[in-house]
C-alpha cells in the first residue's frame, strides 16, 4: 500500500503536487477527516478559496472556518449543491469514499516511507484508468519521482478532470 502519512503529515514535499491540488480543488468543496484538518498548517485553515467540510465523530468538534459534520454521508449531502467536491483525506475517509466517488486523482510517489502510519486504500474492482501523467515512467521533482493517474467508474466521463490534471483544462473543473 502507498504511504500517505507519517506522524500527522505528508511524508514528502512535492510542490508540483500541491500546485495540482490547488488547481483542481479551487472553488470546490473539500471534504476531509479531522486528522487531515489538524495536519494543515494553521495559516491554511481553512483552505482558501474552497468550502472546507470536516468529518469528526466527536459531536463537540468545531473547526473554525469550516463546516463540521459527523459522517461521509452528511459531508456529501452538504456538498451536493455543488457540481463537484473533492475528498482530500485522510486514509480512513479515502477508504470509505471509494464506494461513493466516481473519479479519483492519485499521485504515486516512488519512495519507501519508514515509519509510515497512514496508507492509501487499494484501487480495485470496477475502477478504470483514464490517463497518467506521464503516460509512462515518472516525473521528477528534486530527488523524488512521482506520477499522477486519473481513475473513473464505468459510465463516468472523466475528460474534464484529465484535462485539468494535465494542465490543459479549466482551473475549475
Regions flagged by a language model, labelled:
Residues 1-173:
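Enzymes that bind and transform nitrogen-containing heteroaromatic metabolites
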